[in-house]
Amino acid sequence: MNSEWQSLQPQTQQELKNTMNAMQPPQSIEEIKAGLETTEKGGVRQSIRNCLTVFQRDPLLSGAIAYNILTDRKDIIKPIGFHRESTALNDTDMKYLLLYLEETYGLTNEKKIDNAIGIVANENKYHPIRDYLSSLVWDGTERIRFCLRHFLGADADDYTYEALKLFLMGAISRAFQPGCKFEIMLCLVGGQGAGKSTFFRLLAVRDEWFSDDLRKLDDDNVYRKLQGHWIIEMSEMMATANAKSIEEIKSFLSRQKEVYKIPYETHPADRPRQCVFGGTSNALDFLPLDRSGNRRFIPVMVYPEQAEVHILEDEAASRAYIEQMWAEAMEIYRSGRFKLAFSPAMQRYLKEHQRDFMPEDTKAGMIQAYLDKYTGSMVCSKQLYKEALNHAFDEPKQWEIREINEIMNQCISGWRYFPNPRMFSEYGRQKGWERENPATDSGNPSEKTMDGFVEVTEQMELPF
């Protein structure tokens, strides 16, 4: 087996094998007719086998019908004698095919013809994005590192480079390995007219591989919104803004497949994701408030006044630049020297960087202000609810306690959680937090401290 064949991805090798198996040498119409099965009376048998023979060997139809792995549809990929607007097989195409098989071969059973089309398409699979990416030859000039600076004026630093490289690796991986784990959204943030949406559209290479039509994450037909697209833009983060909760957003981005039944099919099927998601926002505080971390969102600030060119100034040149950037990305992908995640150091930087893009956390601010003035060494959730959040006469609900716990554990530094309940004079036995460097207490441990709690000694523990 030669080196060119070995360099192909396994999926591409299998697709080529399927294509070669399906591509029987075309024969003349008379030769095909002579080889068709007949009935006892000498007529053409209306069988799937006969229909399949025609689709495989007819000089017009041989190699014409293929299954598009990206769109999950059947395509007609070569001229077959009538005008067509797109490659996807549609109802009008079927009428022409039925007419051709009836007039040329006497085959008239529509169901058997349709079954034969399904078989021949399945034996002749292709993936347009894989074919495109595999055809690229890199010229050796580095572009990923400078792309966002070139078109959008972003900082030309390691973070911007790693952010775009990670996104490109995710997109390539999803094309060659549908359903692979990739839950990252590259988010371009900056003023209107900077070219953010255009960047994602051109990044998709072909307009039909791009979509900005995703408005709701809980749409029952979300698979139809993703089907056939490679780069999905969430314009102004509308879909995440309309989400019911941060957990819904996390779940959607983490999903690796959709389970969906295409109309007129009998059974639902797993549809592994072949797309990645990019976000655009004019507003700075676009990130959803998530105290446990927004690691799925990678914001990059853009400054169009610093861009070397506007992306639409010369669209042909911009497309050529992006094509060579994909060629560079394919070199990285083929090398295998990449991960679909940030390094630990970059993750730490991202966590700090994201704070600039989150809405103000008013409750965390109130608790921090309270603790800055508080002179005691221990606090509990109930105390913070009543004293820091000003609910002196209310009892906290369970979700409010969980929210305070999350703030203390995720947003407040200098305090350490203790899991074993201790006695607070105002609030009873409670779990809570203690200062990491409390002042030395020289008093009797049974005496009330400045916090209003009594330290429980071993002798004071309840005997049950």
Where are these regions (language model features)?
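A composition-driven signal for long, intrinsically disordered, charge-rich low-complexity tracts
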Residues: 3, 7, 15, 21, ...
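Feature primarily recognizes SF3-like P-loop helicase cores of small DNA viruses
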Residues: 102-127, 181, 208-212, 218-253, ...
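P-loop NTPase catalytic core of nucleic-acid-dependent motor ATPases
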Residues: 117-227, 231
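Residue-level preference for alpha-helix termini and adjacent loops
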Residues: 60, 66-69, 75-76, 81, ...
